[in-house]
From Swiss-Prot:
<keyword id="KW-0732">Signal</keyword>
<keyword id="KW-0027">Amidation</keyword>
<protein>
    <recommendedName>
        <fullName>Protein FAM237A</fullName>
    </recommendedName>
</protein>
<feature type="signal peptide">
    <location>
        <begin position="1"/>
        <end position="33"/>
    </location>
</feature>
<feature type="modified residue" description="Leucine amide">
    <location>
        <position position="113"/>
    </location>
</feature>
<comment type="function">
    <text>May be capable of activating GPR83 via the GNAQ signaling pathway.</text>
</comment>
<dbReference type="GO" id="GO:0005576">
    <property type="term" value="C:extracellular region"/>
</dbReference>
<dbReference type="InterPro" id="IPR040439">
    <property type="entry name" value="FAM237A/B"/>
</dbReference>
<keyword id="KW-0964">Secreted</keyword>
<feature type="propeptide" description="Removed in the mature form">
    <location>
        <begin position="114"/>
        <end position="181"/>
    </location>
</feature>
Amino acid sequence: MADPGNRGGIHRPLSFTCSLLIVGMCCVSPFFCHSQTDLLALSQADPQCWESSSVLLLEMWKPRVSNTVSGFWDFMIYLKSSENLKHGALFWDLAQLFWDIYVDCVLSRNHGLGRRQLVGEEEKISAAQPQHTRSKQGTYSQLLRTSFLKKKELIEDLISMHVRRSGSSVIGKVNLEIKRK
């Protein structure tokens, strides 16, 4: 029979058990993480949101870098691979803004809040909806538009700050480099 005054005997198995539990969680958790999806994988990306977010960011850029989405992404790749620190800073700022726009698009589509472009179906749906539902949706879409306009102003301000800091020659050099490739 164990001596009631000897508490070390009880303490050791508990600390050993806790240690095993912690080590087990650290070793087992990576196996569970493999089932999670990588949000940055292009095969998992929502192509409509990717395209619309790219177009939106491209339209906000003044002066215009490219007329196509692929040209815009060529420009982004150039900025990322450039060794100029200002190019890298501009890339990360634009990437963050793109990601914010993209995530907003994906979330709104997944939750049914995004605009659906269904020809003919839109009239049927709006006719079947009660009046109070339509007014709530109008308020929400107005909030989305306000949020979008604020983001657009933020992006334009950010881009103009980068252009002023580095001079417009940076944009010209970047455009020349892209055209050469």
